[in-house]
Amino acid sequence: MKVAVLGAAGGIGQALALLLKTQLPSGSDLSLYDIAPVTPGVAVDLSHIPTAVNIKGFSGEDATPALQGADIVLISAGVARKPGMDRSDLFNVNAGIVRNLVEQIARTCPNALIGIITNPVNTTVAIAAEVLKKAGVYDKNKLFGITTLDTIRSNTFVAELKGKQPQDIEVPVIGGHSGVTILPLLSQIPGVSFTEQEVADLTKRIQNAGTEVVEAKAGGGSATLSMGQAAARFGLSLVRALQGESNVVECSYVEGDGKYARFFAQPILLGKNGVAERKDIGKLSAFEQQALENMLDVLHKDIELGEKFVNQ
């Protein structure tokens, strides 16, 4: 099993690489790539951790050596949010980075499962899909926008509010991965109920949690460590599914039947070929139904922006 992390020298990439080095199955290969010259050194640093995970680092313009033979590619490359920016401000820089890296994936390991972390995810996943399509290698069951951070934040905030153990809570989060497109389905948590005010406040906090971190870091960065953990959780779920484990379910932003939007975050059953089944989002409360309808314009525009970027 080979996992490649692109953007491995950044805040998310280093945290993700550390978690994968300690948690990937024995005998796995982990390859780190970043344009930054420090990347081979990050790999050497991590190589001293005593786990049976082989690690190599690559830097420079060409990601090909890192991608050769990869089963899973996780992309965190790009610029991070600063105070006053929203995820869409990142578009101008990150769109080009994602296009370039996905073109290299299409040439080098076209059958790999691809997880996109680089924001704005609503748009960068659409860019990746169009690049793969142009190259003639697009499989919608193998491309994922990693929205796991919304899930782990929801789990944490609900557990805090209700005095529960966070590991006992699993909140499905649907829609997209920015602002109003993030919709935690709080009505679907077994044995936990909320007042209308709690639902409104929690939903808003989950939607704005990224900004909470950006402001708390006072210009020194964005959510890198929690995002690293979220990406590791999702990446390790992909590994377990590829190895044949059954009933591996994660919420992820994928191309589906287009009922709400071309790309939509929903619970996904993972399997040996990526998406095994897009699970139904289930029954929504009136609040959730309204929030879903209200987000769709934004989501459609985000997706269209990515499609146009590649096809203009």
Swiss-Prot record:
* Active site residues per record: 177
Function of the molecule = Catalyzes the reversible oxidation of malate to oxaloacetate.
Stored PANTHER family:
MALATE AND LACTATE DEHYDROGENASE, MALATE DEHYDROGENASE, MITOCHONDRIAL
Question: What binding partners and quaternary form does the record give?
Answer: Homodimer.
Catalyzes what?
(S)-malate + NAD(+) = oxaloacetate + NADH + H(+)
KW NAD (keyword) present: yes
**Organism of this sequence:** Yersinia pestis
**Keyword line:** NAD, Oxidoreductase, Tricarboxylic acid cycle
Q: Which GO terms describe its molecular function?
A: L-malate dehydrogenase (NAD+) activity
> Which amino acid positions bind substrate, per UniProt?
81, 87, 119, 153
Q: Could you tell me the superkingdom of the organism this chain comes from? A: Bacteria
Q: What is this protein called?
A: Malate dehydrogenase
Q: Which family does it belong to?
A: Belongs to the LDH/MDH superfamily. MDH type 1 family.
InterPro entries under this entry? Answer: L-lactate/malate_DH, Lactate/malate_DH_C, Lactate/malate_DH_N, Lactate_DH/Glyco_Ohase_4_C, Malate_DH_AS, Malate_DH_type1, Malate_DH_type1_bac, NAD(P)-bd_dom_sf
CDD domains, sorted: MDH_glyoxysomal_mitochondrial
